[in-house]
């Protein structure tokens, strides 16, 4: 993540284009807040006529019209309070939605390496918690700044109107208060960043337990996970207490500064020259206004913590939005590729690794042929598939499809030529039919979806489901067995009918009987298309046109099944290990 420290103003300037489309709501809210603050000031100003005329003169009419004014002011405060709260909430909701949409859209365009380096819990926290913090903290801060700022201005005007000499004393404390706020602001920003990171750790810890709850139960890891969660939760609590401490310390400092000013005002009011200009009503209004200033001053100090929290969250989100998305500089588009694939001197190293996963790999797969990759775990087989789909880009060398470097094609066009069935099947919380026709629900007919399911030998169990193809399968197909989930994925690939097929341990989750049944469908699927088959079970690739043996990122053997057995090398050794020969 980019932790470049942006000033509050710079961060706010970046946020403003997102907020500005809803500025009418902000303007209405600001006007309502000013009216709300004006109501408080006007209520306070009624003290002078009440004391000097209402109680001072027996025949005064002040006491007769004063109740009507009070009722009118209270109605104004109530209505303005409602309007301001509604408008701010409306703007806040819109900003949260826009931030989440922008973040979600940007993340979808990020390279696979980005997700490899970030925990799912942390990213979820960014989309949910941080986005909410930007709007809620900033909107709360805006309400306080406008309302309390208007209150301070109104109270100063009131004080200067009745006694400018006494009011000048308060001007002295303004620079001191601003200095305190500035010092505390830096502390708030630092703590807010730590709180966001802590929230990401809390989310990641909870997500890890929820996703791996079976492993936690079977291995007795409850204490380990509880301790881990308690640790990150306590760290977040500590950051929260630091925020409270910084805020709590700044409050009494400002109040102490203000109290000295008030004490000096009382002392100055006893000077004969000043006393001659004051009445009981005037001194009461001036002194009451000074006491009333304490509340907005305290609120403005506290709002700084809220605003800094929002700006820190905003900065974190912008650091993600500033990250470069997948490079998609290609211009070529394919309707349907022939399927000629060539790897030429390809070397690749994962961003977080020191040693390359593939070194100087070269191979050619003619259109319509089946090439199998075999080797021990971690040898680099799946990396080859990842490079062919441009989930990663090569560090050295080139990969060609129909004679053109993969980087010359638009990403969407390139990936549209490839159907992928991996050992890690991901299904969506949707119906069986929509999972088979994922992202193309309106492109295929019901009959085509059902035919693909039949070819994948999936209709046998689909018919037994409560609603057949319209059955909801839960998050990641939790209501299906591993083999059933894999058959749905194979049906998805069959329906897509792409010219290039990648089978990455496609039958690994199937039992022997299901594997035999589906192998016929896979054999039919592989006809007239280029197939790259990554296999652990060697029995599934005996009929491949060519078998490549990958070891430590190198192709160490190549040939068909029989020739590799006769060579008595790595492939022959793997074969003997599997079949007990």
From Swiss-Prot:
GO CC field: plasma membrane
Annotated membrane topology: Multi-pass membrane protein
UniProt-annotated binding residues for ATP: 375-382
CDD domains membership: ABC_6TM_MsbA_like (cd18552), ABCC_MsbA (cd03251)
Primary residence: membrane
Compartments in which it is found: Cell inner membrane
A Pfam family: ABC_tran
Alphabetical list of InterPro entries matching this protein: AAA+_ATPase, ABC1_TM_dom, ABC1_TM_sf, ABC_transporter-like_ATP-bd, ABC_transporter-like_CS, ABC_transpr_lipidA, P-loop_NTPase, Type_1_exporter
Annotated keywords: ATP-binding, Cell inner membrane, Cell membrane, Lipid transport, Membrane, Nucleotide-binding, Translocase, Transmembrane, Transmembrane helix, Transport
Enzyme Commission number, as recorded: 7.5.2.6
Description of how the protein assembles with itself and partners: Homodimer.
Domain comment as written in the entry: In MsbA the ATP-binding domain (NBD) and the transmembrane domain (TMD) are fused.
NCBIfam families assigned: MsbA_lipidA, PRK11176.1
Protein name: ATP-dependent lipid A-core flippase
């Amino acid at each position: 993540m980019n932790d470049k420290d942006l000033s509050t103003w710079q961060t706010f300037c970046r946020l403003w284009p997102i907020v500005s489309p809803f500025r009418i709501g902000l303007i209405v809210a600001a006007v309502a807040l000013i009216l709300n603050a004006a109501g408080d000031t006007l209520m306070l100003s009624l003290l002078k006529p009440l004391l000097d005329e209402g109680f001072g003169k027996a025949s005064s009419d002040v006491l007769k019209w004063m109740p009507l004014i009070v009722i009118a002011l209270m109605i104004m405060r109530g209505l303005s309070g409602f309007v301001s709260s509604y408008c701010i909430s409306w703007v806040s909701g819109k900003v949260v939605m826009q931030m989440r949409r922008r973040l979600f859209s940007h993340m979808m365009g990020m390279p696979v390496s980005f997700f490899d380096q970030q925990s799912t819990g942390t990213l979820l926290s960014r989309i949910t918690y941080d986005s909410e913090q930007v709007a809620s903290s900033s909107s709360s801060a805006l309400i306080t700044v406008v309302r309390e700022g208007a209150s301070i201005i109104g109270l100063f005007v009131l004080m200067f109107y009745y006694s400018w000499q006494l009011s000048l004393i308060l001007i002295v404390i303004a620079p001191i208060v601003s200095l305190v706020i500035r010092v505390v602001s830096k502390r708030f920003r630092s703590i807010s960043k730590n709180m966001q990171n802590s929230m990401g750790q809390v989310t990641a810890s909870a997500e890890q337990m929820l996703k791996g709850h079976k492993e936690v139960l079977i291995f007795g890891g409850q204490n380990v996970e509880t301790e881990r969660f308690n640790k990150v939760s306590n760290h977040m609590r500590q950051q929260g207490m630091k925020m409270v401490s910084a805020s709590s310390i700044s409050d009494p400092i400002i109040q102490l500064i203000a109290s000295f000013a008030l004490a000096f005002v009382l002392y100055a009011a006893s000077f004969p020259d000043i006393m001659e200009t004051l009445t009981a009503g005037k001194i009461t209004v001036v002194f009451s206004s000074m006491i009333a200033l304490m509340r907005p001053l305290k609120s403005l100090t506290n709002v700084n913590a809220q605003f800094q929290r929002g700006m820190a969250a905003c900065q974190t989100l912008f650091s993600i939005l500033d990250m470069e998305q997948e490079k998609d500089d290609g211009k070529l588009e394919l309707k349907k590729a022939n399927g000629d694939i060539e790897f030429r001197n390809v070397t690749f190293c994962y961003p977080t690794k020191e040693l390359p996963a593939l070194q100087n790999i070269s191979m050619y797969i003619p259109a319509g042929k089946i090439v199998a990759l075999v080797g021990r775990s971690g040898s680099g087989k799946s990396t080859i598939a990842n490079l062919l789909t441009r989930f990663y880009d090569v560090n050295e060398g080139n990969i060609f499809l129909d004679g053109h470097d993969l980087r010359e094609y638009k990403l969407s066009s390139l990936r549209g030529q490839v159907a992928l069935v991996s050992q890690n099947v991901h299904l969506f919380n949707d119906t069986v039919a929509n999972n088979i026709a994922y992202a193309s629900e309106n492109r295929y007919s019901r009959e085509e979806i059902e035919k693909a399911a039949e070819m994948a030998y999936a209709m046998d169990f689909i018919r037994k489901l409560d609603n057949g193809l319209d059955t909801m399968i839960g998050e990641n197909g939790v209501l299906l067995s591993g083999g059933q989930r894999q058959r749905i994925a194979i049906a998805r690939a069959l329906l897509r009918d792409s010219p290039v097929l990648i089978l990455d341990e496609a039958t690994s989750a199937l039992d022997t009987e299901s594997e035999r049944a589906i192998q016929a469908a896979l054999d039919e699927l592989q006809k007239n298309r280029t197939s790259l088959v990554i296999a652990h079970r060697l029995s599934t690739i005996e009929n491949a046109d060519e078998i490549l043996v990958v070891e430590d990122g190198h192709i160490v053997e190549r040939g068909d099944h029989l020739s590799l057995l006769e060579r008595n090398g790595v492939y022959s050794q793997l074969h003997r290990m599997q079949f007990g020969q």
